[in-house]
């Protein structure tokens, strides 16, 4: 049962609706205004719900500026879009981010925060997660956590590649659900960053067992999904995944356009082309995880 302060949370209904209608919410990591615009425009064009994901770097780099901009854009959109802080690994940053969203300020902030203590021991991970979940919940913010370690490197995430990889078990999932989280990001062969020469090797049976154990109580989140095919997404959604995090598949388009066209176009045109390329990548993801067109159904059910 969600914390009483979460009754008006904007993000929780998205995953609940996605799970019950067999699709996933596209959750796109971005670092700048172009990325924010690309997600909003893609969601409105595809009539898809979505999440904008910022890393703690956004707060360290620009204080509340990017957060307020993204949060305001989410609330002004014609489809359901929410703002999520991804891979928040410093307790003080988590509290700072949560305080940006306090209702008494009358300014929008994060709708959800990933409390990522996976770089600590399991016991410390659980203790800190429980403490920080309570802090976020009291401010009306939904939470996500990551049992085990989803190895690899990703821009904005502390590298765990040298740590022993740990896959999530149903028993660990139960322990994390007990901390009060709303969403769980299990490790079942998915990794942040590059998958290496063997390619994608997912343990679907493990994901199914986790879903059977806790899927009725928390939403399941897929990390490390950048190279996945539509078939892989379908298998994950069949096993309970309701939110798909994507980073490089979208942000690589920014880098590609900048490398190819910087210096040959006016700056205004360059920013437009970057945004258009990122938007096209987001729309492709929406089609692959079947969120296209679902916003209308969500709004009809409200």
Swiss-Prot record:
CDD domains registered for this protein in UniProt: TBP_aldolase_IIB (cd00947)
Binding-site positions, Zn(2+) 2: 116, 146
EC number: 4.1.2.13
Residues that coordinate or bind Zn(2+) 1: 87, 192, 223
Protein name stated in the entry: Putative fructose-bisphosphate aldolase
PANTHER family per UniProt: D-TAGATOSE-1,6-BISPHOSPHATE ALDOLASE, D-TAGATOSE-1,6-BISPHOSPHATE ALDOLASE SUBUNIT GATY-RELATED
Family: Belongs to the class II fructose-bisphosphate aldolase family.
Role description: Catalyzes the aldol condensation of dihydroxyacetone phosphate (DHAP or glycerone-phosphate) with glyceraldehyde 3-phosphate (G3P) to form fructose 1,6-bisphosphate (FBP) in gluconeogenesis and the reverse reaction in glycolysis.
Organism: Coccidioides immitis (strain RS)
Gene Ontology MF term list: fructose-bisphosphate aldolase activity; zinc ion binding
Gene Ontology terms describing biological process: glycolytic process
């Amino acid at each position: 049962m969600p914390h009483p302060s979460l009754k008006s949370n904007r993000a929780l209904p998205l995953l609940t609706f996605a799970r019950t209608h067999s699709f996933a919410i596209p959750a796109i990591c971005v670092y700048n205004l172009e990325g924010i615009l690309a997600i909003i425009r893609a969601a409105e064009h595809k009539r898809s719900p979505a999440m904008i994901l910022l890393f703690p770097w956004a707060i360290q780099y620009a204080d509340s500026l990017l957060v307020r901009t993204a949060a305001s854009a989410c609330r002004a959109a014609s489809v359901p879009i929410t703002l999520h802080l991804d891979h928040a690994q410093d307790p003080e940053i988590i509290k700072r981010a949560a305080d940006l969203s306090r209702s008494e300020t009358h300014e929008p902030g994060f709708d959800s925060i990933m409390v990522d203590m996976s770089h600590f021991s399991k016991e410390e991970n659980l203790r800190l997660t429980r403490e920080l979940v309570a802090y976020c919940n009291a401010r009306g913010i939904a939470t996500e956590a990551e049992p085990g370690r989803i190895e690899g490197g990703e821009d904005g995430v502390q590298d765990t590649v040298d740590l022993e990889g740990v896959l999530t078990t149903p028993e660990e999932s139960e322990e994390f659900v007990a901390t009060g989280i709303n969403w769980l990001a299990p490790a079942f062969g998915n990794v942040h960053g590059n998958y290496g020469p063997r390619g994608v090797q997912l343990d679907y049976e493990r994901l199914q067992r986790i879903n059977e154990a806790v899927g009725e109580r928390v939403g399941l989140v897929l990390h490390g999904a950048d190279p996945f095919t539509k078939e892989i997404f379908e298998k994950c959604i069949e096993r309970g995944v309701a939110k798909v995090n994507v980073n490089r598949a979208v942000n690589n388009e920014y880098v590609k356009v900048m490398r190819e066209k910087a210096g040959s176009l006016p700056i205004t045109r360059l920013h437009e082309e970057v945004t258009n390329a990122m938007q096209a990548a987001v729309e492709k993801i929406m089609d692959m995880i079947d969120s296209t067109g679902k916003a209308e159904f969500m709004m009809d059910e409200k």
